[in-house]
């Protein structure tokens, strides 16, 4: 499978209000990194064993919700857009009570 070339301008972004009350965009990964930094700081040295699932659920559920809205419930189209097979999509939708 060939990896698609991605234009940095097409990256997922988050709108942020800066100190000068201006709306700017920053990559989603920066927001995820900051959220993880905050979460880990709150742990105060404690270990956690489900961080991967926690983060995945925080991103995966809204992503599935939005893609299903975008495709108007067309699971085949949604699976193609996500780059997964339809069976996998159906399992994920069921996991989040969406299917």
Curated annotation (Swiss-Prot):
DNA-binding region: 75-94
Record keywords, A-Z: Activator, DNA-binding, Transcription, Transcription regulation
Listed GO MF terms: DNA-binding transcription factor activity; sequence-specific DNA binding
Pfam families in the cross-refs: HTH_8
Keyword Calcium found: no
Superkingdom in the source lineage: Bacteria
Family: Belongs to the transcriptional regulatory Fis family.
Quaternary structure and interacting proteins, as annotated: Homodimer.
Function: Activates ribosomal RNA transcription. Plays a direct role in upstream activation of rRNA promoters.
PANTHER family: DNA-BINDING PROTEIN FIS
Name of the protein in its database record: DNA-binding protein Fis
Native organism: Haemophilus influenzae (strain 86-028NP)
